[in-house]
Curated annotation (Swiss-Prot):
Species name: Methylibium petroleiphilum (strain ATCC BAA-1232 / LMG 22953 / PM1)
UniProt biased composition (Gly residues): 1-10
The gene coding this protein: rpmA
GO biological process, any: translation
Assigned GO CC terms: cytosolic large ribosomal subunit
Keyword flag Ribosomal protein: yes
Similarity annotation: Belongs to the bacterial ribosomal protein bL27 family.
Keywords: Ribonucleoprotein, Ribosomal protein
Name of the protein described by the UniProt record: Large ribosomal subunit protein bL27
Gene Ontology MF terms: structural constituent of ribosome
Record lineage: Bacteria, Pseudomonadati, Pseudomonadota, Betaproteobacteria, Burkholderiales
Region (Disordered): 1-20
Amino acid sequence: MAQKKGGGSTRNGRDSQPKMLGVKAFGGQAVQAGSIIVRQRGTQFHAGSNVGIGKDHTLFALVDGKVSFAVKGERNRRTVAIDPV
């Protein structure tokens, strides 16, 4: 006879790691070239002037300056730009 009952099984017990997405530098904030402005999945925010886009759609500053957000075009696209200082 078994001294203990069987352990059973469960379908739970796993979780994905956090991805730390979102806006990292807000409007009016001063940033340096290379600073990450937005980490995102897909292009929720589009790159404006002086902003580069990485292969995972991360937006980053190409020059030193201040961050500015705007809604542009007939599709109401949210764009991020850097105003050089």
